């Protein structure tokens, strides 16, 4: 689990310039240095560990968690961790209705699958060069926008967001559907929008990587707990059956 040393080394304590702050984050601020708000890492550590446990427990209950982060500093890191633990993600651009109009998103994913089926069967080679080029360009665009959610069959039970100020459409959709939001909370963000905030820098690459790493580990730990519970339940069932047959 995350330590104070991890937070310091990754620069999690550096907030935004004082003129860009959201006054609602006052309770998370330790002080000011060179017109930069410094986040109170004692509070960050406490919120981090609490939120880690929330995410772990959600995962242990079989709940699905989606990763969202489209800005340049975050998109590749977020994709790397999301793919490594096989959770849905959006790292290029949030399409309006990704959650609130999910059935339409599924139809777009189906278009991507149809194009891939055409490629695999060789059917695409029967088209003219111009038609083939148009379809392949469409496939590239669909994959860029929807590649991370193509295996998502239902809306997620929770979302982990990097930069709630930038991802305001995703946050608004999640709140509308009462989907809990987990997110690092920088000094320019509104804490009222996040169910499980972790006070910290959401711009520095090392900080973003730490957040993604810890949330991924929480999800994996939760899955292990769920498997242990299943094995334990099976053992109990076999024991009961053995006793009843005696």
Swiss-Prot record:
What Pfam families does this protein's entry cite?
Ribosomal_S2
Question: Does the keyword field hold Ribonucleoprotein?
Answer: yes
- Name the CDD domains on file: RPS2
Gene Ontology biological process terms in this record: translation
Question: What keywords sit in the KW lines?
Answer: Ribonucleoprotein, Ribosomal protein
Q: Which GO terms describe its molecular function?
A: structural constituent of ribosome
Recorded GO CC terms: cytosolic small ribosomal subunit
Q: Does the keyword Ribosomal protein apply?
A: yes
What InterPro entries does its record include? Ribosomal_uS2, Ribosomal_uS2_bac/mit/plastid, Ribosomal_uS2_CS, Ribosomal_uS2_flav_dom_sf
Family per similarity comment: Belongs to the universal ribosomal protein uS2 family.
Q: Which PANTHER family match?
A: 30S RIBOSOMAL PROTEIN S2 PROKARYOTIC AND ORGANELLAR, SMALL RIBOSOMAL SUBUNIT PROTEIN US2M
Full protein name: Small ribosomal subunit protein uS2
């Amino acid at each position: 689990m995350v330590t104070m040393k991890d937070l310091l080394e990754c620069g999690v304590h550096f907030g935004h310039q004082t003129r860009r702050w959201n006054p609602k984050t006052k309770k998370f601020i330790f002080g000011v240095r060179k017109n930069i708000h410094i986040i109170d890492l004692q509070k960050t550590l406490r919120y981090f560990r609490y939120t880690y446990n929330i995410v772990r427990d959600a995962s242990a209950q079989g709940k699905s968690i989606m990763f969202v982060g489209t800005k340049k500093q975050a998109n590749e890191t977020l994709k790397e961790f999301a793919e490594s633990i096989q959770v849905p993600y959006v790292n290029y651009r949030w399409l309006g209705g990704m959650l609130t109009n999910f059935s339409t998103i599924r139809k777009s994913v189906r278009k991507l699958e149809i194009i891939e089926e055409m490629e695999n069967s060789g059917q695409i080679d029967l088209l003219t060069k111009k038609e083939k080029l148009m379809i392949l360009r469409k496939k590239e665009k669909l994959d860029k926008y929807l590649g991370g959610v193509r295996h998502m069959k239902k809306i997620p039970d929770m979302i982990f967001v990097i930069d709630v100020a930038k991802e305001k459409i995703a946050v608004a959709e999640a709140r509308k559907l009462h989907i809990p939001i987990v997110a690092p909370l920088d000094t320019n963000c509104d804490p009222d929008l996040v169910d499980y905030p972790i006070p910290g820098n959401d711009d520095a690459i090392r900080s973003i990587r730490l957040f993604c790493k810890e949330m991924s580990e929480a999800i994996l730990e939760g899955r292990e707990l769920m498997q242990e519970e299943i094995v334990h339940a099976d053992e109990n069932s076999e024991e009961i059956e053995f006793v009843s047959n005696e």
